[in-house]
């Protein structure tokens, strides 16, 4: 049975072009799988950057609670720290950034802070972390 999350992951993989530099954040299971799928099927020269700082990990492990496990760094062919990802993106070198969000409007703006009134929210979210830098500077986010 094909699940909606499988279809979304395949659609995300299709967005990655051969030679793209691709970054995903924390708890980004579908983007991590999409990046690995794209590298195996049609984009072998895509560069996989991840939040622990690993580049093209050889033995990625999908954990239930995070996509930022140490094996993404331990088995990487190189290390590229998170602060360098921001710099790369601001210089125009980041092709794809997969970032999470809870609410999106028609213009693509992301809400990752609160649902409801800011001072008395129904739900308080973790925040956007680097989204404010990466969304406007990555070629595709």
What do the PLM-derived regions correspond to, one by one?
Residues 1-75:
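N-terminal active-site beta-alpha-beta segment that forms phosphate/nucleotide-binding
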Residues 62-141:
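Conserved phosphate- and dinucleotide-binding cores of soluble alpha/beta proteins
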């Amino acid at each position: 049975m094909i699940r909606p999350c499988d279809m979304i992951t395949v659609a995300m993989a299709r967005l990655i072009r051969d030679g793209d530099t691709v970054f995903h954040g924390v708890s980004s299971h579908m983007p991590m799988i999409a990046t690995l799928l794209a590298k195996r099927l049609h984009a072998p020269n895509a560069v996989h950057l991840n939040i622990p700082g690993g580049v093209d990990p050889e033995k990625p492990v999908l954990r239930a609670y995070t996509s930022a496990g140490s094996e993404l760094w331990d088995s990487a062919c190189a290390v590229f720290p998170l602060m360098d990802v921001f710099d790369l993106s601001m210089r125009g070198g980041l092709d794809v950034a997969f970032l999470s969000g809870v609410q999106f409007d028609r213009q693509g703006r992301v809400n990752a802070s609160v649902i409801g009134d800011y001072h008395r929210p129904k739900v308080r979210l973790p925040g956007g972390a680097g989204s404010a830098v990466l969304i406007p500077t990555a070629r595709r986010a």
